[in-house]
């Protein structure tokens, strides 16, 4: 009677190979996912689209120094019938006028109020275009030392709430924070003098790393950089001033022209 010799090693190799094939097949099946669209309409994006502006004077007498006043929270409730035409809006411009703080530290009440404003945005899926200024109907801004002090106070709050800040505007200087009519930084000029340069540098240092900073006039950026070299693809989205600084055109679609937005000192407003 013939004896059948069984090669244990060959059998083991075949079993291992079989198990490997089974595991691979099971793995492929387990990772097979079918995606089906549940919504075909436009969905809101918190960094795109049209904006509205909320702003106001932060008063020492306020129980809470909010720009988003309790009576204005309806603005963020997009299920409200009054907001039917704004269902997909997720951007808002917030203007903080520090009228009562031109010669003193920002109060803890104001800083807490800012924090709570940011939480309201967060709760409703909004982001903001953020600007601070000292006056809306005159050129009476604050002295340089107070501007720098206020930026220093606000810096940790900006960092903490970077997730709901879309972009920051330099602000602080002049009427509306627009860097033109000013009591302390040169009046009716776009010139980047030493005081303005210090404010811009303080803002560059204070803005959260992954957020951008907008200046009112392109000339301010050109003067700060000292050249007109274009931004390269390699440098874009980095934290360098050339990549980080943009500009906001407050005269966009203005009936009176661009109000000197793209001019240089000595040129007419629409040259």
Task: Show which residues each predicted segment covers.
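Boundary/entry segment of secreted carbohydrate-active catalytic domains
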Residues: 31-90, 95
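Short, flexible loop/turn elements at secondary-structure junctions
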Residues: 96-98, 132-136, 158, 172-174, ...
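Catalytic-core regions of glycoside hydrolase
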Residues: 167-271
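Sec-dependent N-terminal signal peptides
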Residues: 15-24
